[in-house]
Amino acid sequence: VSDRIPQRILDALTDVPMPRLPEPLAPDDTILCGDQRVPLYRCGALVIGSGAAGLRAAVEIRRRGGDVAIATQSAWGGTSACSGSDKQTLHTANTADAGDDYRAMAQALRAGGAMDADTAYIEAVGSVRAMASLQYLGLPLPQDRLGGTLRYQTDHDETGRATSCGPRTSRLMVKVLAEEALHLGTPVHNHTTAVRILVDGGRVTGVLAVRPRSESAENPHGFVLFACNALVLAAGGPGELYRDSVFPNGCFGSLGLALEAGLELVNLTESQFGIGTRREGFPWNLSGTYVQVIPYIYSRDAEGAEHNFLADYYRSTQELASNVFRKGYQWPFHAERMLDFRSSLVDLAIVREGQKGRRVFMDFNRNPAPVPGSAPFSLDRLDPDVAAYLRAAGASQALPIDRLRHMNPLAIELYRRYKVDIAAEPLEFAVNNQHMNGGIAVDTWGRTSLPGVYAVGEAAGTHGATRPGGSALNAGQVFGTRVGEHIGASGFARTPPAGAVAGAAAVVAEICALLRPETGVPVQDIRTEVQARMSDAAGILCVPEDVSTALSEARALNARLCQSGVAPRRKGEVGRALQWRQMALASEAVLTALDTYIAGGGGSRGARAICDPAGEALPQARTGPLADVRFRKERAADKTHQLVLRMEGEAMTVKARPNRAFDADSRAFFERDWPDWLTGAVFDLESDAPAAADQPG
């Protein structure tokens, strides 16, 4: 692919084999739940999910003497292992040149508002340790000749704190962490889907799951029970929530699971959307060099005619080309960037083409077509920041594909691995849902509102309205480590719980009553309705009336599911049916939070423009004002708090809470603060100690 990088290196960075799992463990016991005989496993701590964050938590618990197991729907098959971009980013404090300022980094992490200041500082100061430990495990982060980590600029990053192993950074992270987890003897229960958290006395006692291989005449639904003292939710984000999604197929996350257990969720209004290839083929983010080489973006109508549609939006070819380039490091849609002919006008234009029934393509064998009345495309006619970047990269080649081959041959090689040759044919793409910034509410140790339950990774709502690219991978590592430290200090996980699992039989009976193969709502109907509603009403353009209508429809669907149940289509689909029931709850939760925010006067920020005929902001195009997307601006006061949602019975309640503060002027003092570390006072263990009967021996 390139004379600069040998093929064997390209292969190693794109084809990343994962470790083989050991043989499944036999259950510790079998218990009778009604008329079902259910296998029972006991562990001190259970991690749900096998992505980078969950594996980090499992490794850190194991290193501290914990008896930990992992339960996963598909080992090495989630977002961490199967997603990426041109050079997938890990965002950490800069360890080269003059180093970094953790407080400045924390400020950058929460610059978009609605993020806790203490969390931002934790992610900043913990990032160096997280990166170093990954390097110790074998993650091949690039260095200069003197040992400094190579850096570049990414989304919402004015300093240049990004680094990368190439398009498969997170998969490589999963690989080294999985190898370590297996080396430490961590059991992995594969093809095991958690469907209900068990609670007794206000504390977690276990998890009910389903596993197809456990199906039998005495256990027709394949139930599996895990008894545990601590539970870590690390199943990622709700990728199936949207029709237009760049998540790998089958990523459900655990928001619905958390709602059913009464956990508090936070910042559900905050997501991330951006351009990428659809998951019907090979889902991948088209950020970085894919757009920095400035390919020709066009649409095709039903008759096959091509449309240079971006020329309707930008005033000159130079302006158009420069903003296509800027999508490389301004990749997520941002409402404010629709103004003044900036880069998110590209996203808006793509969405509007889709609404016309047109398909949108990126052609790497053609430079951008000119804007009418403007000069043709030329590398000599670009905005200064764009020209400087391409000059520094040595990207003076005539065609986008040659510039891409020079700047990042891995970007070409990756698609070729999935039978897509972008050097030979145009690439179809769209604006897709990519990340949930909100999630399960956690404190500074990753604890949720239910004692004994923790959340890490995309499952945890630690991000604000915006975030730097790659900061989510860092947050998962930092909080995975902190959760491991906290569980280790508590002693919860040293010994598995003994005795009966309270409430298991009642939960099994409740779920059996919900499963109605003959009369329930078909799984496909739930999927189609939820995904269409979320993509059409809760994407980058939100019309208040449409959001309210969507919420009413979501409530009606959940009421129908409560009354009629859900119908698995075939044997082995019980887990998927229950996940879609939970996804319907998650959809209602997101729409409830969004409707509350909008009804309270909330404005546009981050991923969503709140369209309003009386809005202060009016995007302009070359052809005139875009009145249909006039939008409200964000109120400064909304940056200072977050919306917390909880399900009580069948109703969802929302309340605002202020962002947690952090005293940037405070200073630790060794002699004063060392005793808190030595005694474990830093872990605040008194607030969630298990009942005496559950204390490890």
Positions of PLM-derived features:
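An anion/pyrophosphate-binding glycine-rich loop and adjacent beta-alpha core
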Residues: E264-L410, H486
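Long, amphipathic alpha-helical stalk/connector segments used for oligomerization, subunit docking
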Residues: F492-E573
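Glycine-rich loop(s) and the adjacent beta-strand/alpha-helix scaffold that form part
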Residues: A230-W284, G470-H486
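Core beta-strand elements of the Rossmann-like FAD/NAD(P) dinucleotide-binding domain
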Residues: L40-C43, E218-A230, S449
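Glycine-rich FAD pyrophosphate-binding loop
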Residues: R63-G84
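Conserved redox-cofactor binding core of oxidoreductases
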Residues: P22, A130-H221, A234, T277-T289, ...
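Extreme N-terminal leader/targeting segments of oxidoreductases
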Residues: V1-G44, C165, E686-G697
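N-terminal Rossmann-like FAD-binding beta1-loop-alpha1 element of flavoenzymes
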Residues: C43-I70
